[in-house]
C-alpha cells in the first residue's frame, strides 16, 4: 500500500504544478530551501525523509512572516530546488566525481559477489541478493558489511525479504541508485553541502557514510574558538537531576554498538533507548524527549537520520538525475499535503545516544587549526528542557534558525526548523513562546567576520536564486508602475522586499560565479591529489584489515585453546571412570581364565607345528651360511681390486700435484707476460697518441699546402688563359697581314686570269673575304658562316687558325658546299 500511495503522491505533485504557479509566492517562502520532508502518520510502515534547513544569508532573511500562501510557497520553492539539483548534477566536476564513485561502488559490489560465489552460491542467487539488500553504513570495512548483509539475506531466503527490499534490473542500476541515496543522505544530515561537496566527502571517506557526516574537510576550530565554545557551552548544560522538569538525557555506551553494522536510516538497539520517556504524561498525549548534547569538548553533532522506505518509482529504469528529481517531487507533495493539518511522523529512532557524539569527543589538545578555506559546519548548542504543556523537549532561546531535534515517546525523531517549532508551540500552548539557545559557534558567527561555511551556504542560496531567476526573469510582474514618477509603487511589504532585492541579483550572480570557479578549481586539485594518494591509502587500509584479521585469528586461537583445555579435563574425568570400570572387569577376566587355559592347550598343538616350521627355517639358515662363505671369497677379490685402485689413486694424486706446480709456474709466467703486455700496451697507446697528433698536424699542413697550391694553380691558369688570348690575337694579326699580302698578289693575277679566260665575274656578296676573287664555298660549324673559298680555307687550316673570320667563334667542322651553276 505504501508503494501505491507514494506513486499517487508524486502524480498529485505533477498535477498541482499549474495550480501552484497561479499563486503569488511570498519572498520569505522563496528564501527557504530544502524544507523538512514529512511522512503520513496514517502509514505505519513509512518513515519520513528528515532534512535540516540550510543557513540563510542575513541580508536575505525577511523580517515579517507572510503566512497566507505558506504551503504554496513551499511547493514552489521545492520546484526551484529540483532545477538547482539538476544543474548541480550537470556540473563537469560532479560528473567526474560521479564516475569515480560509481566505479568504486561497482568494484565493491563485484568483490562482494566474488566472495559469495567462492562460498558456493550461484551467480543468479548472489546477484539477486546483492540487488535486493540495502547498503550498510556502519563500521569501518564497507565490503565486509555488504558481504555479511548479503549472506544473511541468502540464508533467510525469500522468507527474509520484506516490503522494503526491491530487486533492481541490473548491477548498474543498483550502483546508480545507491550513489544517489548516499548523496541524498549526506545532504539531509548536512543540508549546507552541495551535491559536489557530498560526492567529494564520499570519495575522501571511501564510501563510508558515517565518516562522510563528520569528514575532516569541515575543518576544526582553533584553540581560542574552542575555549569560547566551552565557556558558552557550559551555560547550556542541562540542570541537575533533582529538577523534575529536566531529566538527564539518556546515557548510552558507544562501545556496545561498535561492531554492529547499521542500515540506512536505522540505529543500533540499546537498552537505554526507553529512558527518554516521561512518566508524568497522560495516555492520550505523546511525550517527546529532546536528545541533545552540550558543546564541552566536542566540535559538532551529526544525526544519521534517513528514510528506511525508499521511493519505489525510482527503483527501475531511472537515471541519477531522474531519481533525485522524483525524490524532490515526492517531498514537495508531502509538504503540500501535510501543511493542511495532518500530523508529523519522524524517522524511527531506537537509540540516538551513541550517534550524538559520532566519535567527535576529543581532548582539547587534539584540536588543530585547519585551512581557512575548509567549510565549518555550525555546531548545535544543546539544552534539555521539558515543555509540560506541549509534552516534548526542545531547545530554547535560539537566535538563528537552527534545526531542533524532537523525540516522542515511541522513539521517533523529527528535525524541525526554528520557525516551525515556534509556530507549533504557540498553537499548542497559546501563550508560551519557545525560543532556541544558539551554540557557541553561532554566537561567535554573529559577532565576527562570516566564516567559510556561511559563505558556502550563501553561495548555495544565491545559486538557487539564480535558477529561480531563469524560470521567472520578470521580477516586477504584478507590481504597479507609476509613469509620472517613473518608479514602481509597492503595494505591500512583499513588493518592497522585491524592489530591494532585485538590484542585488547581478552582484549575487557574479559572486556566485566567482565562488563556483574557485570551488571547481579546488575540487580538481583535490581530486588529483586524491588519485595520487589513493594507492597508498588502499595499502594502509589493507594493512589495517590484516592487523584486525590477525587479532581476530589470535582471539579465535585462544578460544580454541580454552575449548581444548576443557575437553582435556572432560577426558581426564572419563579416564578415571573407565579405571573404575577396569577393576570391575578384572573379576570378570578371572572367570574367563579357565576358558583361556583351554585355548592354551590348543596353542601347544600349534607350537608343535611351529617347531616343524622352525626346523625348516634352520635348514634354510645353513644354506645361507654356505652362501656367506662363497661371498667371503668374492669379498677378498674385491679388496685386492680396491687396493690396486688405491695405488692408482696415489699415482694420480702425484701427477695432480705435478700438474698444479706446472700450473702455478705457468700462471706466474702468464702474470709476468700480462705485466709486460700492460707496459707494451701503455707504450703503444702513447705511440698511437703521438701518431694521431702527428697525423692531425700533417692534415693541417696538408690542408695549408693544398690551399696554397689551389691559389697558385688558379693564378697560373689565369695567366695561361691571358697569354693564350694574347697569342691568338697576335696570330690573327699576323694572319691578317699575311692574308692582305696574299690578297694583293693573287687578286691581280686572278683578275687578269679571269679576264683572259673570259670567266664570269663573281658577285660582290659572294666573294671570299680573303682572296676577294673566288666564290665562298666553305661553311664553318657550329656558327654556320660561309666566308672563305676552298683554297683560302686550306690555307686558313694549315696556318692553325681555328677561329671564324666573321664572328671569331671556334670552328669545330668545315664543310665544302657545292652549288649548281646556271647555264
Curated annotation (Swiss-Prot):
PROSITE patterns hit by this protein:
ZF_RING_2 (PS50089)
- Zinc finger spans (RING-type)? 768-808
The UniProt regions of compositional bias labelled Low complexity, in chain numbering, are 224-240
Q: What InterPro entries does the database record attribute to this sequence?
A: PIR2-like (IPR046934), PIR2-like_helical (IPR046527), Znf_RING (IPR001841), Znf_RING/FYVE/PHD (IPR013083)
For the region Disordered, what residue ranges are annotated? 24-72, 224-291, 432-464
- Which regions are flagged for Polar residues bias? 61-72, 267-282
A molecular function GO annotation: transferase activity
Recorded domain comment:
The RING-type zinc finger domain mediates binding to an E2 ubiquitin-conjugating enzyme.
Q: What is this protein called?
A: Putative E3 ubiquitin-protein ligase RF4
Source organism of the structure: Arabidopsis thaliana
